[in-house]
Amino acid sequence: MPSADLVLPAPMSRVAVVAPTSGARACLVELARAGCVELTGNLPPPEGEAVEALRRLGGRRRTNGGEPALLDRPPDLAALEREGRSRLLSGEIELQRHARLGLPHHSFTAWLGWTPATEVGPLNERLAPLDSAVVELTPPPWAEPPTQLRPVPIEQPFRPLVQSY
């Protein structure tokens, strides 16, 4: 009989994601694919051509509804609007909002965030081909990391107690 699962928080690391400014989009798309980095900062309001295209789609029948999606390369927004691709338009809007959280410095841009400590190495492997990297930072004393829960078998915490009898 399978055991029930207990969820415990995963240890989180404060990180900076650094990418060449020319490759910022590719870096953010890869971060979205990985799905394990929570960028920090106040997201700016949506703006731009993608927002207007999505608003115009509001009165028409949409296709591909659901979660936002991204393409590797910048899409033709007019074509997405004609095709009713609201998921891709929504994804572009979110990508642009997160891109504006970046802190540019010369030819690089950096984003601050949190990720599970176990994901730092795998993220660096994913970002290396894009000339990007994840750097662990010491969190400020006042910062409290977000909580990400991970399931663990319930009997593991009690195993020493049971084995002692």
Q: Where are the regions that the model predicts?
A:
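Long, charged N-terminal accessory/stalk domains
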Residues: M1-Y165
